[in-house]
Each structure stands twice: as C-alpha cells, then as structure tokens.
Amino acid sequence: MTNSVLRVVEHLRERAHDVLIVAPGAGPDSYRGAPVVRIPALDVPGVGSLPIGVPTRTVLTALAGFRPDVVHLASPFVVGARGLAAARRLRVPSIAVYQTDIAGFAAAYGFGLATRAAWRWVRRLHSRADRTLAPSTDSVEQLRLHGIPRVHRWARGVDIERFSPSHADQALRSELAPNGELLVGFVGRLAPEKEVGRLTALAGVDGIRVVVVGDGPELASLRERLPGAAFLGAKYGDELSAAYASLDVFVHTGPHETFCQAVQEAMASGLPVLAPDAGGPKDLVLPGRTGYLLPADRAGFADALVSKVNDLRDDALRARLGEKARKVVLGRTWPAVCSELVGHYEAVQGRIARAA
C-alpha cells in the first residue's frame, strides 16, 4: 500500500469511518483497525520491484459483503479495473485516483508501442468512474486532453514533523562530506522512469558529493556511472528524515511524475529543489524562490543542473530558498488534504457514472 493510501486510511479511521482495504501481495490483514483483503500479485517482467495484483472474484465478494458508500480506487490499472467493475455492478459510486503516468512509465521501460494502448486503457477505466482525482495541474490537463471526463485536482499532504530541518544529522554530514563538500541528493526508487542517471552530469565536479537514497533495478548501473557518489540504500522513518535534512540541495531527475512526493518532502526538510520543468514538480517548485525548474530534455537538464548547483554553493542563497520551501508546504498537512478527499467522497454520493 502506498504512503498516500495509508494516510487516507488513518484519517478515516480517526474519524470513526468504516474502511475495507483490498491490496495485492502478502502483508498484514489489518491496518489501524481496517481489515485488509489480500489478493495474489505477480512481478512484471523487467519491472520486478513493482508487482501488480491479479484480479479475482475476491474483489467483488469483499465489496458486496462490506456494502461501502463509496469505492476509492488507488491508481486503477489491473486490480482497480476489477474494483471499478464491482462498484458499477453493486451500484456504488467510485472515485479513481490517478497516481502513475502509465504512458510515460511504458516509454521509460522501452514499451514505446504500448504508449497509445496505455492511454486507451486509462481512458476506458477513468471514464467509468464517477470522479477522477489527479494530483497536479499537469496531470489534470493530460487526462482532459485524452478525453477523460470529471477530472478534479487532489494533491498530496506532507508530514511537516517527520520532514523538517531539525532532523539534520551532523555525524552523517561529516561522514558524507569530510572535506566540506556540497551534498546534492536524490531520494527515490532507482528505476528507469526516474532517470537517476542524469546525476552523472555532476560526476567529477570539484566540491560536490552526490548522495543517492533508495534502491531498485538500476542500482548496480548507477554505482558504475557515479563512482564517487554515496549510495545509502532505502531509508525509512527517522533515517529517511535525517537523510533529507542532512543534504544541501535536493535534485529530482524524472520527468514523468504526476505529483512527486519526494520534492514535497525535501521542501519540508528545508532544501532548495532542482527538478525538471515537467509534470508534478511544476506545481511544487517556485522558480527562484524555493528552487529551480530545469529543462526536461536530458541535454538541457544536464547543463542547467551543473549551473544551478554551482550557484547553490552560495550559503545565503541556499538558506533563503530552503527557508521559503518549508514555509510553502507548511499548510499542506495530511489532515487538510484528507478532509478535501472526504469532500470528494460526499460529492459523488448517489451518482453512478455512465461509461463514456
């Protein structure tokens, strides 16, 4: 289950709402008092770190027994399609949350011919939901351009206590930058769609230490391409908080983000952010105020990355951008965002969409 789904469940349970979760793969059979119905999961060839659920009649059976007022479909693609069909059969309103740029994902994994097919499938699914929620202005526009109706924007929250400059670890900084290097970091899954290899533009730049936090299928390749970088592996909880807050600059490299929670967590941690001028980061980064948006193409990104990182050697500039970055996200708490989601639930009550 994704972090956003867990935060939604927590919000609903704290307010005494009944919740049933249907999730792929092995795991606990409950979360915060909400039962979890488990369905089988399979690895996608070439994308082993992202297993997908196998649709079964269990979805319909579970929903029929639970009798929900609304069905929340988190990033529907395979299992979500079965959930949507079950909701329509039971005449229960549904909300589909668009979280993954499926077409961009397909292209990143070399499935270029599947891009159009992916959009056809996305359109078919989301057109049958009573409301689609997309996390950024860019993703809302993309969905509407592809003919998907009833699209609304619903962003993501951030835990401003978990992610804060106060979690900086001076011992970690000393270990990573023994000679006072500028620590430029990436946090996320090391996979083709993230294009972490763009950080090679910084390889060999004097006074710069690249820090990579995460794991995934590209790890071995990235170690070869970034021999001087520090690879910290996947971090969670307090270690993740410390990793963010101990950096000087945060860089996100992938151009296919529908939102980009890592950017928001970095901002909450008081870091200036460099990210492609594409997708979700366009809503999050205020150029010249909280960081900079760089050209989305690889060559342009590489040139701008080196230039902006060199600019950010200036302590005063980093401090100003980082302070503003945190201020910008202080109002984006999970309770506020989840209350907005409940408003969407209420808006679809009694409405069953027709297939477009």
Question: Where in the sequence are the language-model features?
Answer:
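N-terminal subdomain of nucleotide-sugar transferases
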Residues: 1-40, 334-339, 346, 353
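Donor nucleotide-sugar binding/catalytic pocket of nucleotide-sugar-dependent glycosyltransferases
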Residues: 23, 119-169, 178-179, 232
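Short alpha-helical donor nucleotide-sugar binding micro-motif in glycosyltransferases
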Residues: 63, 126, 234-235, 242-247
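Conserved donor-binding/catalytic core segment of Leloir-type glycosyltransferases
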Residues: 177-207, 211
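Nucleotide-activated donor-binding/catalytic signature segment of Leloir-type glycosyltransferases, i.e.
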Residues: 220-238
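Aromatic "clamp/platform" in nucleotide-sugar-dependent glycosyltransferases that forms part
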Residues: 255
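Short hydrophobic beta-strand element within catalytic cores of glycosyltransferases
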Residues: 272-275, 285
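Conserved acidic donor-binding segment of nucleotide-sugar-dependent glycosyltransferases
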Residues: 287-288, 292-300, 308-315
